[in-house]
């Protein structure tokens, strides 16, 4: 995958281009606000490849690294 949410640097923003996940995970990510075209900002990373703190609009979400790798972004 070209650029995933997992590769974003804290403090930077990006747009969601696609969500490459199996159906159940895709539905869960969509329900949390990860939709194509949305602007997101990575707030911080957990230690030792821990979860990511992401801001989508005015909503803060914590997401696992492996799930973040399913979200393709464009800077």
Q: Residue locations for each model-derived region?
A:
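A structural micro-motif recognizing beta-strand termini
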Residues: 18-22
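Short, solvent-exposed coil/turn segments
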Residues: 9, 27, 47-49
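Phosphate-coordinating loops and pocket residues in cytosolic domains that bind phosphorylated ligands
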Residues: 31
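C-terminal structural segments of small proteins and small subunits
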Residues: 3, 45-75
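Short alpha-helix capping/helix-loop boundary micro-motifs
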Residues: 1, 24-28
């Amino acid at each position: 995958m070209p650029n995933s949410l997992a590769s974003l640097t804290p403090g930077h923003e990006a747009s969601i281009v696609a969500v490459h996940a199996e159906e159940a995970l895709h539905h869960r990510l969509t329900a949390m606000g990860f939709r194509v075209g949305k602007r997101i900002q990575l707030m911080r990373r957990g230690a030792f490849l821990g979860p990511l703190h992401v801001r989508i609009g005015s909503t803060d979400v914590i997401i696992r690294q492996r799930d973040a790798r399913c979200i393709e972004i464009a800077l």
